[in-house]
């Protein structure tokens, strides 16, 4: 606890033990370790000490006046071997066998071109060496750069020998230097592909260049064989894409005529008047056929209602007008309203349908009246009952009314059925009651009069109503 009382609080800042000022800068302290500075004690070291020391003299030169502009030391580095540019079309056309005298002259021209190219290469290598010495990047980088550039020059001289007639000698020195530095792997592959395609188009029937003559002769024989096969019309199983030039269809060997008959086809059908397999057309095509028919399904599909021989069209017989009788032709509707009909069965009300309810009055002498109701949509008959004098109507709720009648459409064919009608508005119920009371005294038919008119046993009681 005592230490904590003597401890300096954290909020107090650290201060100097002595106050320094301009008059007392702190140099006149009485410390034992310090001693006054003595003047005149700095002397030159002895010769023995100087002999043991290593004196290094630094020479500074002005690089701004003598040094050339900085260049990229990695400009001459190439990761792929150099190849000569693609030969011109004129050189490709003159690739025919030459006589012995012409070959000797050509060899002399090539040797001269090689010498001139070597001279240019040496001058370029000297310039590159001079630039590499001036660089401060290190001796190792300049040595590697020189080796890589020398290798590229040798490859370039070998490639020049394969050029026809010394065509590359006529190029300028700047073009050769630029091509040597900027050549990449993609250019090499492109040159090889162009050479292969040009040899294939020409048929490979001549010997080109001094080196690889046997291989070129072999390719010429293969090209002649392929041309004979295509002229004879022989259809192979699957032809190689390499054997066809860009102007030919690569799919020619798949189905004899390929896609020449139509743009899209399934199967082959002989053309009219043809005997061989060379003129065939598609039986199912989306393009134009050879014989001029533009049928969607080819010339084989000839089923049509119209025949070409008779040029007559078979028309379907027209349907006869049939009169539809509903049985209401000699009747007049005294009441019409939309309602929902229910029937009392097995101690409960079951819905029988929704539709238009009519009270029809016959226009004949008997003036018979009946109830007719048909469902909406299909006009199915759901109620057909004649009115009788003893018919009683009972009110249900505010919008409904119930009664007993003989419904010819009901499942219970013998006796009366207890029905109920529900309308949208109470006023419609009163109107319906008035129409029934007015026309129920009409005389029913003989069959309906003979039926016993009594309350059915399954009729609901007054409490249920």
From Swiss-Prot:
UniProt-annotated stretches for the region 3 X 2 AA repeats of F-G: 266-298
Keywords: Acetylation, mRNA transport, Nuclear pore complex, Nucleus, Phosphoprotein, Protein transport, Repeat, Translocation, Transport
One Pfam short name: NUP50
Provenance organism: Arabidopsis thaliana
Location(s), subcellular: Nucleus, Nucleoplasm; Nucleus, Nuclear pore complex
Modified residues annotated as Phosphothreonine in this record: 455
Start-end of Polar residues biased regions: 456-465
Protein's UniProt name: Nuclear pore complex protein NUP50B
């Amino acid at each position: 606890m005592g230490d904590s009382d003597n401890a300096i609080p954290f909020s107090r800042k650290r201060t100097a033990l002595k106050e320094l000022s301009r008059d007392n800068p702190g140099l006149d302290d009485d410390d034992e370790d310090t001693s006054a500075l003595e003047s005149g004690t700095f002397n030159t070291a002895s010769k023995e000490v100087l002999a043991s020391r290593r004196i290094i003299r630094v020479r500074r030169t002005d690089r701004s006046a003598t040094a050339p502009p900085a260049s990229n030391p990695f400009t001459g580095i190439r990761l792929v071997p150099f190849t000569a540019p693609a030969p011109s079309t004129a050189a490709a056309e003159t690739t025919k066998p030459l006589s012995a005298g012409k070959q000797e002259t050509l060899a002399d021209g090539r040797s001269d071109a090689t010498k001139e190219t070597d001279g240019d290469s040496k001058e370029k290598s000297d310039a590159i060496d001079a630039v590499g010495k001036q660089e401060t990047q290190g001796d190792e980088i300049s040595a590697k750069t020189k080796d890589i550039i020398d290798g590229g020059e040798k490859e370039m001289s070998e490639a020049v020998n394969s050029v026809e007639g010394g065509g590359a000698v006529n190029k300028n020195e700047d073009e050769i230097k630029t091509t040597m530095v900027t050549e990449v792997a993609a250019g090499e592959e492109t040159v090889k592909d162009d050479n292969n395609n040009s040899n294939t188009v020409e048929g490979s029937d001549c010997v080109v260049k001094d080196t690889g003559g046997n291989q070129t002769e072999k390719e010429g024989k293969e090209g002649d064989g392929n041309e004979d096969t295509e002229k004879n019309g022989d259809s192979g199983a699957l032809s190689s894409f390499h054997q066809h030039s860009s102007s030919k269809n690569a799919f020619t060997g798949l189905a004899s005529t390929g896609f020449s008959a139509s743009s899209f086809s399934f199967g082959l059908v002989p053309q009219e008047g043809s005997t061989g397999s060379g003129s065939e057309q598609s039986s199912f095509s989306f393009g134009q056929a050879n014989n001029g028919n533009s049928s969607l399904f080819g010339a084989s599909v000839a089923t049509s209602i119209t025949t070409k021989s008779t040029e007559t069209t078979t028309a379907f017989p027209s349907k006869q007008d049939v009169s539809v009788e509903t049985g209401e032709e000699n009747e007049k509707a005294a009441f019409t309203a939309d309602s929902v009909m229910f029937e009392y069965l097995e101690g409960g009300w079951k819905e029988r349908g929704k539709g238009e309810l009519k009270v029809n009055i016959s226009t004949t002498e008997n003036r018979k009246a009946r109830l007719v109701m048909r469902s909406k949509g299909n006009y199915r008959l759901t109620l057909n009952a004649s009115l009788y004098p003893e018919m009683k109507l009972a009110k249900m709720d505010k919008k409904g009314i119930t009664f007993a009648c003989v419904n010819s459409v009901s499942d219970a064919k013998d006796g009366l059925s207890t029905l109920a009608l529900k309308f949208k508005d109470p006023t419609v119920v009163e109107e319906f009651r008035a129409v029934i009371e007015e026309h129920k005294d009409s005389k029913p038919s003989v069959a309906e009069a003979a039926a016993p008119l009594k309350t059915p046993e399954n009729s609901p009681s007054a409490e249920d109503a």
